[in-house]
Amino acid sequence: GLVGSEMCIRDRFVSVVRNEKEITSARWMTTGLGVYELYVNGKLIGEEILKPGFTHPYKTKRSFTYEVSNALSKQAGAENVFAVQVTPGWWADKIITYSGQQGMVGAKVAFRGVLELTYADGSKAYLGSNTSDWKAGIAGPVKHAAIFDGEEYDARELPGYDTLDKLSTPEKNTEFEGEILPSNGGEVYFREDLALSPQKAYLWKGVTGESEDAYGKVVITKEYAAGEEMVVHPGETLVVDFGQNCAAVPAFEFMAKEGTQLNCRPSEILNDGNGAKSRGMDGPEGSCHRLNLRTPDTGMLLDYTFADHKDYTTYRPHRTFYGYRFVSITADQEVRIRSIQSIPVSSITQQMETGSITTGNKLVNQLISNTLWGQRSNYLSVPTDCPQRNERLGWTADTQVFAETGTFFANTADFFHKWMRDMRDTQSPTGAYPGVAPLAQYGASPTDMNRLGWSDAGVIVPWVVWKQFGDTQIIDENWAAMEKYLNHINETKYDHHALSAENGNYQWADWLSYEPLESCSGRHTAKDGSGTLPEAYDYWNYLSANYWLIDAGMMSDMARATGRDAAKYEAMAAQAKQYILDKFLNADGEFKTAIFNTMQTPALFALKNKLVEGVAKENMMKRLRDNFAEHGNCLQTGFLGTSILMPTLTENGMSDIAYELLFQRKNPSWLYSVDNGATTIWERWNSYMLDKGMGPQGMNSFNHYAYGCVCEWMWETMAGISADTSEPGFKRIIMKPIPDKRLEFVNAEYNSAAGIIKSSWKYEGDQWIWDFAIPEGAVALVTLPGESQAHEYRAGSYQIVK
């Protein structure tokens, strides 16, 4: 623990410790208010970056413990210098502050630590951070660093990690009164194994074709070959394309005269179309587009001032991160860049990645890659929505719709244990879960609670982790919080009006859909400003009641798994189902609210939750088929509808439509973004359109993983690998592949909680050949394409020809 230590204020802390006796080992237990880095005798300690991570600012901080023996001088009487640098990230930072308010910005950063020394005679000493043995000052070269702002670095200043010069006595910090817990999930690392080199680079100076309506097109003066040294002069702009959008930092090897300032500006996309303003461009064609970052002039910056180096020097930011594919570089004097790379930043390490799936279709493979890169980018301390703009928050619906997909690509159990603590920290006294966790600039205010599909992540995520990993601990940790939530929505029937004091009389609902009712576009609100349409309230209540039913069903599953009262939640689920049937559905399968019958998402929830059967189900399925046909075999769903779209179609005998949607290339579709050069999943189906340009710039991310939830269906239907809740953690595997010749083949391998599961199929003429493998100790229920009878297979490798 950290007993006996104090929080010390300032942003550079140094303590010189004289060894009373010979040291055999040393551990340093640390945390901070703000992003902190540790140094012993000038050596950086620990591989994790952006410590202590994103948590509820007032309730929880994570601690990191390091074995530092190898960095010490161990002999008796020797002196060792311990130093810490703290910057505002995650604490005195805009990410914590409500938009437009001062809030936490400018709050005092602090450090807390305990050094445990073990001497050669077996005795121990504990040295805590305090105001008497530590000195503090203003950090040297790091002039400013924060999550949204970026980093400003002046290499002319000495780091000062090995000296007490220019330091004074620190203050004692009393601002944090929460709990300090050991870090165990959500740590952030550089992904050196994924380092990206330039795929294209060019210098431009001046523009042509500029007019009142257009910024014109850049004049390219030089294109650089791979590995070629790049030189930037004043008045020139260097554009570097790394070929992959991701959360990352640029890493330089460069040289310039002392005092030269280099400015690096990241972006996700380039301006095009002669910089036409009508297309949403913010500069000439070929320049970096930054308008979608929302603070392009004041945020997401990287400024570096050179010291008096006679040779090349290296630099990469350590105290922030960016979301980008491109960078734009300018300088006020000549800068020679021998090397530049983009180093991805993620909480998903190489060792955590568990699954790979490939097909014979290049576009589908790119979609899978886009999804994986979206997860790498957005599983960053918390499951964020996007890594690039002034947001980067733990949006709860984004998290729940993607959670199961994410478990196939990586072992996310510890990551979600950590995040569910953030959820509990942000839960309201009534039991309502927030729209964002942990508490941040918005999305978790007292009127951002009980948002349908968002709040439900508090139940859905633990259920997914339990199902996929066989992890009952996450149920135990969250049971009281989940019960409180279910009791709350059960008492109110999850009714929008009954909860309006908590939900702000607004719902995000099926966010960014193309349906007739959709919150973001204003189609829930009358154009004359008269307020929300009655049909919208009906829609919100219909969707929330479906989540009430889903939540209750998941609670009954988790209750059975842990020896709790499942009957209570089975009864609650039955109550929710009857409520939906009575209030929203006619006996023939038509919705009582007429506009629902023209939409996809209402029908999908009805089919998923088995609200209709017999003729009523046939009628609903026909309407749904007709709806897809009317829209040219295009989906119309948003965040919530898309999350259940493909599995629901498949479970209800409409896998043919699911495959049509997968292969669709018109807007809206998954492959539309792929055809338009996407390397990650977009926030909107139309974040960019070849004919119209950029989507709405106030909210337009090109790295937003939610729609990557289609990969859950790819794993479970294309490859035919899914977990059975009767024996979770893939001890009992459901293997039910549904192939399509347009894929040519599928190769999938998943290192599950039960061991490695393999599923590979291909077509040879009219023959379908399936090879699959079941790990030792597991059992698979195998259903072949076109059949309904499942057969049990034990551990081993098999081939079936059909």
Segments predicted by a language model, with ranges:
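Extracellular/oxidizing-compartment recognition motifs
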Residues: 5-6, 10-389, 414-415, 437-439, ...
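Alpha-helical support elements that line or immediately flank enzyme active sites
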Residues: 26-27, 249-268, 327-330, 398-427, ...
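Active-site acid/base region of carbohydrate-active enzymes
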Residues: 35, 129-138, 334-370, 376-377, ...
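Helix-terminus loop motifs that line ligand-binding clefts
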Residues: 47-58, 269-295, 413-530, 669-692
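C-terminal capping/lid segments that line or modulate ligand- or cofactor-binding pockets
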Residues: 82, 153, 390-391, 409, ...
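Non-catalytic C-terminal accessory modules of carbohydrate-active enzymes
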Residues: 103, 107-110, 114, 128-165, ...
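Short helix-capping and inter-helix turn/linker motifs at the boundaries of alpha-helical repeat units
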Residues: 240-242, 318, 393, 452-456, ...
